[in-house]
């Protein structure tokens, strides 16, 4: 509840930042908002823009979206007549840019949550990481929200809470740890009432996948990937139109339905929801095409002999897809992955590192930093941007191989419950599923081991266009696994008439035409032995 939140006064420099903004608004100066290139960045800037337009409808605001995945402000792109630059969700470490702006007589406010070594002397930095603010797991949009709370206080209005839906979605998308009670409170409050027309259009577009449920999981898996795909893979025009949709533009975009000749005008929120779905599909096709090329390089160079996959993708992969592809490779090869590309300007390799969450290394960022061979590793524990010199690449590869020589990379499942056959029931599965709104952001959906089930192999259905889905029913519970490997299916079908099987999976509910059935989505399974009965 709200008692778990912290007063905005605990954020250093926040009152100075508010006074600075109000000065420029009262003087009708031009304000420049730098939008950061991810969901949290877009939601942060949308919240700030919409709030300012509520308190000063005629304010002069211009905004800029980076052409790639750059973070922070690019000074050269700021028009000469700008008096104030605001950087939500980025910019704390742009000391050089802050100094240039100050020398030009331009004020700069940073509303950020990323770690930084020191506080800038030439900008007003509001960042929960550089002060005594207790909640370090609050994303950029959360800091912007606190900033707007101070504006509420100063102007005697109550507008900030209108944007809690953006606070919720930004924190979910930025993978904040929702075990922080303040962050969890704001997320749950924001999800209770989605106001933003664009997010509503996205939810409508994804209603089949979400089954109409709005919770942490549905935003994380069905909404955030669409926004991030457009940021990562959309054209500049598509990204700009997406931000317009975020801030409630009433524009329309031309749209011609497939098979029809007449072009219609579609409201920008609906149009961008449709376009985001299409961009993500295009992104995934490009990802899969590049994956094949990279996997061929892995085979040619025998890179699987290494404990951590380190691959130069300079001539292969678009930089915007680096993290996405690294994640796919880590899942497939069950080990951490580092994808590198040479940066001529900086004369070193940069790229993305991704850990394997079922492996033995639980924090790949810290693991890389501990080697002392990387220039930097910035980001989340299992997903970070890295830099390394050419000379250190081969050396660090040898270090990792020696350090991990006794490690076998295989799936390790830390289950919450082990249910023997006597405890397996439909009521248990339905009971676990009732807590679905809690899972996410560091509170993982329980992983259950169902052990000792005796299954007749003829009762295991092989489904799907590729015949790679298995399904069987045990005690009124449907057990389903998608994307099975051929050897997994053979292990079931060619192992006798009756098998004993252990399953690791998560509890779900399937609703169809009013009928509710208990389901277990299988993560993995093991056929222990063939059962033979003599009678």
Predicted features along the sequence, with ranges:
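OB-fold/S1-family single-stranded nucleic acid-binding modules
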Residues: 513-534
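Short nucleic-acid-contacting surface segments enriched for D/E, G, S/T with interspersed K/R
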Residues: 486-504
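Hydrophobic helix-and-loop "lid/oligomerization" segment in the mid-to-C-terminal part
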Residues: 1-84, 103-104, 152-398, 412, ...
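A contiguous loop/helix-start segment that scaffolds small-molecule binding in enzyme catalytic cores
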Residues: 191-201, 403-491
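A residue-level signal for conserved active-site and pocket-lining positions in enzyme catalytic cores
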Residues: 86, 228, 432-433, 505
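OB-fold and OB-like beta-barrel modules that bind single-stranded nucleic acids
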Residues: 378, 432, 498-511
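Conserved phosphate-handling catalytic cores of large alpha/beta enzymes
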Residues: 77-78, 85-102, 106-168, 176
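Residue-level recognition of well-ordered beta-strand positions that form the cores
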Residues: 226, 473, 504-508, 521-523
């Amino acid at each position: 509840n709200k008692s778990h939140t912290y007063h905005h006064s605990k954020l250093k420099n926040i009152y100075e930042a508010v006074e600075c903004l109000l000065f420029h608004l009262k003087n009708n100066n031009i304000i420049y908002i730098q939008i950061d290139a991810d969901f949290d960045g877009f939601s942060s800037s949308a919240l700030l823009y919409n709030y300012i337009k509520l308190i000063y409808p005629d304010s002069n605001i211009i905004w800029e979206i980076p052409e790639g995945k750059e973070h922070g402000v690019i000074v050269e792109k700021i028009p000469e007549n700008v008096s104030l630059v605001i950087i939500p969700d980025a910019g704390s470490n742009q000391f050089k840019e802050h100094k240039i702006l100050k020398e030009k007589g331009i004020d700069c406010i940073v509303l950020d949550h990323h770690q930084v070594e020191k506080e800038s002397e030439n900008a007003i930095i509001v960042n929960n990481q550089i002060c005594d603010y207790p909640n370090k797991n609050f994303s950029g949009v959360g800091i912007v929200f606190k900033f707007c709370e101070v504006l509420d206080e100063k102007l005697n209005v109550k507008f900030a809470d209108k944007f809690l839906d953006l606070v919720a979605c930004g924190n979910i998308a930025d993978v904040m740890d929702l075990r922080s009670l303040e962050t969890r409170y704001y997320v749950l409050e924001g999800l209770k009432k989605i106001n933003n027309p664009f997010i509503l259009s996205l939810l409508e577009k994804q209603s089949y996948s979400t089954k109409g449920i709005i919770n942490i999981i549905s935003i994380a898996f069905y909404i955030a990937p669409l926004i991030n795909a457009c940021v990562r893979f959309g054209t500049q025009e598509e990204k700009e139109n997406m931000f317009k949709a975020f801030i409630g533009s009433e524009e329309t975009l031309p749209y011609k339905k497939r098979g029809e000749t007449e072009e219609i005008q579609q409201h920008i929120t609906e149009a961008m929801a449709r376009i985001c779905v299409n961009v993500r599909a295009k992104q995934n096709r490009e990802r899969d095409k590049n994956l094949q090329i990279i996997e061929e390089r892995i085979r040619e160079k025998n890179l699987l002999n290494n404990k951590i996959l380190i691959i130069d993708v300079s001539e292969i992969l678009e930089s915007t897809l680096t993290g996405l592809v690294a994640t796919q490779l880590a899942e497939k090869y069950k080990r951490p992955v580092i994808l590198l590309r040479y940066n001529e300007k900086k004369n070193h390799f940069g790229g993305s590192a991704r850990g394997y969450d079922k492996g033995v290394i639980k924090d790949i960022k810290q693991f890389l930093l501990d080697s002392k061979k990387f220039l930097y590793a910035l980001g989340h524990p299992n997903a970070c941007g890295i830099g390394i010199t050419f000379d250190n690449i081969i050396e660090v590869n040898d270090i990792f191989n020696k350090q991990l020589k006794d490690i076998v990379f295989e799936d390790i499942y830390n289950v919450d419950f082990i249910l023997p056959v006597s405890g397996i029931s439909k009521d248990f599965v339905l009971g676990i599923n009732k807590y679905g709104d809690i899972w996410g952001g560091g509170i993982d959906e329980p992983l259950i081991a169902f052990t000792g089930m005796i299954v007749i192999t003829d009762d295991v259905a092989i489904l799907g266009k590729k015949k790679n889905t298995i399904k069987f029913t045990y005690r009124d519970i449907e057990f389903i696994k998608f994307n099975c490997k051929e050897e997994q299916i053979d292990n079931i079908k060619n192992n006798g008439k009756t098998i004993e099987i252990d399953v690791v999976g998560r509890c779900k509910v399937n609703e169809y035409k009013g009928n509710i059935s208990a389901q277990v989505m299988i993560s993995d399974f093991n056929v222990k032995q063939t059962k033979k009965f003599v009678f």
